[in-house]
Amino acid sequence: MLLEFQDSIIRGDCRKILSGLSANSVQLTITSPPYRNAIDYEAHIEKNGYYRGKARKETGEYLDEMVQIFNEHIYRVTKDGGYCCIVIGNEVVNGTIIPLPHMLLSKLVQPFGNWNLHEEIIWHKVTGGTNRYGSFVINPYPKYFRANIMHEFILVLRKGDVNSGRTNRNDILPAKHEEFTKEIANSIWHIAPVPPGYIEHPCPFPEEIPYRLMKLYSYEGDLVLDPFNGSGQTTKVAHNFARRYMGIDLMDEYVSLAKFRLDKESIHIRPDALIAKWQKIRSHYLPNL
């Protein structure tokens, strides 16, 4: 049952939908799981609803659900040599950081899970993040410091060993091009977030993230999955770059939004770097005598 799912955006629970998808059919998954407690998505749908900070799930319950989805359902439908990229950040509860990315990762990768960790990329948001430094401005004393949170993690998981699925050598990437040597070559990606209110969704990741991941981990014609499709950033980028796509979301409003955005909006891929060009600088260390 593959053809009926290709190039589709479906409303439903991804666990039920994926149970009807053939095993070993997805080359690449790109997704950002729903925030555990930071976002109330139902309240966001109600235009006047306050949607931040509504506690809904205990950490253990959230992790168990995510482990079931990624270790069982998504792993089963992923091809040998395929990849799963999870965009996820820490949460802050009552002044304490909850390291959800690392807690989840410890349960997904071998020896405790099914996946292999291929890469861990830090998404540096550059122009936006969670403001926590203000409390230190008000109370400029030791032990009051809180850093602004300007990053999330992109966990790149692989099914199979490092050489799995490397038989196709079409679509050579310009590995010496500046986009790849300056921007993608390192484990920190500098990508500005989507401006607040630009898309009718509380937390869309920028299109540049799925664009890069599709370029690096898939070929044209491959099936790309987003089981938490939301506003449709993954499916939109896949559609525009000749990938087959499959998006799943629980809410009718987001399914309709994602379908609408497939052809109605242009792609937003930044042509220039957000950080200065690299250059050698003089060392401040004095030579040893």
Residue ranges and their predicted role:
Residues 1-17, 259-289:
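S-adenosyl-L-methionine
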Residues 1-257:
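Core catalytic lobe of class I
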